[in-house]
Amino acid sequence: MKRIIIASFILFLALTSANARGVKVRSVKGLRRAIERAVPGDTIVLGKGTYRLKESLRIEGKTDLAIIGDGAIISGGVRIGRWRLRKASGMAEGARRLNLKRYPLSGVVTKGDPHLTGPSWSEFFADGRSMRLSEWPDGGPLPLDSVVVRGQGRIRNQPGDGFGTIAFSSDRPLEWKDPTLGWLSGCFRFGWTNEMVPIAEMGPGKTFTAGDLTNYGFGFQPGDRFQRWRVLNIPEEVTLPGEYSLDASSKTAVLMLPEGCKRLEMSVMEDPLIVLDGCEKVTLQGFELCYSRGDGIVITAGRDVQVKDCDIHGLGHVAAKIDSANLRCGLSGCHLYDLGAGGVELAGGDRRNVVRGDNYVEGCRIHNYNRIENQYRVGVVMSGLGNRITACEFYDSASMAILMLGNDQTVEYCNVHHVCMDIEDNGALYYGRSFAHRGGVIRWNYFHDIEVPFNVRAVYHDDGSGAAEVYGNVFQRISSPPVQIGGGSYIRYHDNTFIDLPCAAIKVDGRLKTWGADRVPIMRDSIRHVDSPAFWEHYPELEPYLNGDPAEPQHNTLINNVFCNVAAAFEKVVWSDHFYNNDIEGRANFFDEMHGNSKVEKLDGGLALPERVPPTSQHELHFIHDAFNGAQYGILDERHTAANGNSQ
């Protein structure tokens, strides 16, 4: 017998009463009580309102349960009355000071270590939009052209002295009352590593000394276009609407609210908002999750757990984590945006024993997910074996859309654009540096409008990684070669279409034989994590490949691809064993010839992409609008529909 628990009437009446403020403790207790009492077959429906948490909402060991938000908001923050803001003397016109002694407060912390990440500091949100730390200079980062002390590097243990010192020429920092409130932020050596380290002191000779190690030290490559820096969190630099500065020691903040701001929130909670542990056939639907320093949803040891139609935003870390112990768990139809350090961490499956996870992210819109960290903090990072990303849209990101690690992963029907907008040597879809990462399938995606002055790809097989099949994709308007095979083997590209490129479409190199030879031991070592009879049997080509010369690219296939209006089809094809039937054309009927049963229509003098790319009995990829004119598109198959819409 199924029961429906209407939480707003039974347990949460305070949220619908005339004087309710959405902060009643008994409301959250009631929600927890409803979950505890639920039996298989129940549905819990929450009334509209804001449920403010001080600790994680835990759903443990439940079976066959639906929890429906119906617009309910789960918040890890506090609302701050504007009457608490006072004029900030000595600061810019419009700046206000806020005393935060009554609130739990976390100060700004070091960010940028690719191996360590965690909750953000306490952030402010004005009318639902994140505010940003004050920045100097306002006109953008400064070139790193004067390094006094290089400092040691955290990752490669670069030789150097201490934490590093850089010089500046402006007199403006001399006006700051306390420079040690500031944080140095920027790319201090390589363009793929953006960091934040505290200022330990400002020296008399116009210098800043860092208070922590950076990843690679300062200024090893003077003149590199990515070596740039700025200072964040100085109170005197709160000069533009939407900026703030935070002083955890005095528990105060200086803010300049956007014009017309009606609601101010501050993130407080550090733990995940919702944890689903050991659940089976549980659905969480229709919630808005926001204003937390940590993660939104964490799913552990679940079976058939689904997060559906949720808006997750304003978090200091990631929207959702699905760990390796889950099976058939995922997100569907969710909108993930304004996130601190990535969208979804999608794990699952057993690589050593070759057991699929079948976890997924499908039909989701994921954007603006690098507010705080961007180095390998991506829209979705995949790990494990046998998981998929289907029918998702990724855009407006400083970093990658997808980091594909592990085995037998699938990325399909996705719309990927305007990503990698502020990073170097990356790819919209990226994987690298492991001979064990194999079996990836990248099919029927649309990569487009990645036009930046940096060295980024649409699909990047980095540092010898390979064993992937890439087909049916469309690549359009990308400023660097959309595809790079960086020394890998067993990569098969077929039936892809490349359009409107000012560069070569595909680049293949043999870096493991030359400048990247030092990667080979690292790549070989990656096998030990999955060394088992089951793994070797599943990938029979791997053993002879490793017993030969794995540094030599081999068994790469580039066939049946189409190129139209590109500078060149291939930058280098020396390391391709099979290379034929690649059609390089600029004529209007090239789609007809490439895809025999595809219907091509003229739209406003341009070309519509074919209805099927390539034709298949199981799936259909429908491009609804004229991709030549840069329009949006939709994608359909028998199970999935992509959700399109404007950025929020």
Question: Locations of the language-model features?
Answer:
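Extracellular polysaccharide-degrading/modifying enzymes targeting complex plant/algal/animal polysaccharides
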Residues: 24-26, 32-33, 37-300, 306, ...
